[in-house]
Regions:
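Generic intrinsically disordered, low-complexity segments enriched for polar/acidic and small residues
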Residues: 1, 5, 25, 59-60
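Hydrophobic alpha-helical membrane-insertion segments, chiefly the h-region
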Residues: 19-29
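N-terminal Sec-pathway targeting helices
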Residues: 2-18
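Extended, charged catalytic domains and RNA/DNA-binding interfaces, predominantly
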Residues: 10, 27-394
Length: 394
């Protein structure tokens, strides 16, 4: 049975409407007056009795996290993470696991669903190589406090050299496909082991981590599957580095009968590219029909550790809360109206509605979710029990 259509106590969760804030409204039925002479006095006001009826069907709200990394992500491993996919699901279910910094962590309230979304690029390579790098031996605060300002830079160069020396090679099939496949099998096995229909749902998936031009201009998507019928290896940005190439892959997966979708995240770091539908010359950048984009990417992740992607003060000048949890700037760049337009959900939805009126189609129809992007194998959504993003930063 598809994970995208599961039975939860008689209520069907259709699609991934994960945070649909739908209230169950009680139905009321007015009953006839009670035939009781004692209630018919001159000073008595007769009020029809109201009885509540249980709501039938409808939607329920379920809580989960569709963006969690483990030591299979090379950036997580080189920052001190040693947790595995099994730890993600144990933590999400309420069990205690060990944080990368060495202390035990437990979620305050178990989740209903979760997904391990390790980076498809270099999947499992750093862990297999057992890289011993500065960022796994020393906390970032200590590195930054070092009197020698070159320490951090030297640390990063040491990481890059070790990655190169340990055979992180690019091929047309991806990065060392044998290692990739093995790591992917570990992710799938953990999802199958912890999947409890009607109790706890796991979603196999990965993160497609493409950057436009330079690192820091994010076009990242999480690819989420709703069934156990899966490809043998993740599709990474090495296999296809543009969103249209990813969409073509997703469409081919759909044609094989696999239920899959992509969730864009951190559009706030995309330099306005995340929700752009045409180039500066007006040419459409997606080669699919307008309906395909909203079908393949029905939701966007607009809140996580790297800031809010709902709106920006430059786009919503009259909204006094528009600066809530804004990430600030893309590293090394100043945020301008040009760089933020196309990078925030509220403006994108408005653009989609405008396109529907003016051009007769809307490729920007989507719902919204919040996720963590934790690289600690945890879901740090509780302020009092915040487990951070990476051990070297926590």
């Amino acid at each position: 049975m598809s994970r995208f259509s599961q039975q939860y106590g008689g209520v069907v969760l259709k699609g991934l409407v994960l945070i649909a804030l739908v209230a169950s409204v009680a139905a009321y039925r007015i009953l006839p007056p009670i035939d009781d002479p004692s209630l018919q006095g001159p000073e008595t006001v007769l009020v029809s009795q109201v009885r509540t009826m249980p709501a039938s069907g409808g939607n329920r709200v379920y809580w989960g996290d569709l963006h969690i990394h483990t030591s299979l992500s090379s950036d997580a491993f080189t920052m001190g993470v040693r947790a595995v996919p099994d730890d993600v699901y144990r933590f999400a279910k309420g069990q205690t696991i060990r944080h990368g910094a060495g202390y035990p962590v437990t979620i305050s309230r178990p989740l209903d669903f979760a997904a391990v979304t390790d980076h498809a690029e270099y999947l499992g390579q750093a862990r297999l190589s057992g890289l011993d790098v500065p960022t796994t031996r020393q906390r970032l605060g200590d590195l930054l406090a070092d009197e020698n300002r070159l320490t951090v830079t030297q640390s990063w160069w040491e990481i890059m050299s070790l990655i190169r020396d340990n055979g992180f090679k690019l091929t047309l099939e991806g990065v060392d496909s044998a290692i990739n496949r093995s790591a992917w099998q570990e992710i799938v096995a953990a999802a199958e082991q912890h999947y409890e229909p009607g109790v706890f749902t796991t979603f196999p998936g990965w993160e497609w981590s493409a950057d436009a031009g330079d690192v820091g201009t994010h076009l990242h998507r999480n690819v989420i599957y709703g069934s156990s019928d899966l490809p043998g290896i993740p599709f990474s940005s090495i296999d296809g580095e543009t969103p249209p190439e990813l969409w073509t892959f997703l469409r081919s997966e759909r044609e094989k009968g696999r239920r899959v979708m992509a969730i864009p995240h951190n559009p706030n770091l995309s330099e306005g590219l995340a929700y752009r539908v045409a180039s500066e010359t007006g040419e459409r950048i997606d080669r699919l029909s307008p309906e395909d984009r909203s079908d393949l990417e029905p939701i966007s992740e607009i809140l996580q550790i790297k800031g809010s992607s709902e709106t920006h003060p430059l786009l919503s000048s009259l909204d006094e809360f528009a600066d809530f949890e804004i990430a600030g700037t893309v590293p090394g760049r100043e945020m301008t109206l040009t760089s933020v337009k196309g990078g925030y959900a509220r403006d994108a939805l408005r653009s989609g509605i405008s396109m529907a009126h003016n051009e007769g189609f809307n490729p920007l129809k989507f719902g919204v979710i919040g996720s963590s992007d934790s690289h600690n194998a945890t879901s740090p959504s509780d302020e009092k029990g915040y487990t951070g993003k990476l051990p070297m930063m926590d």
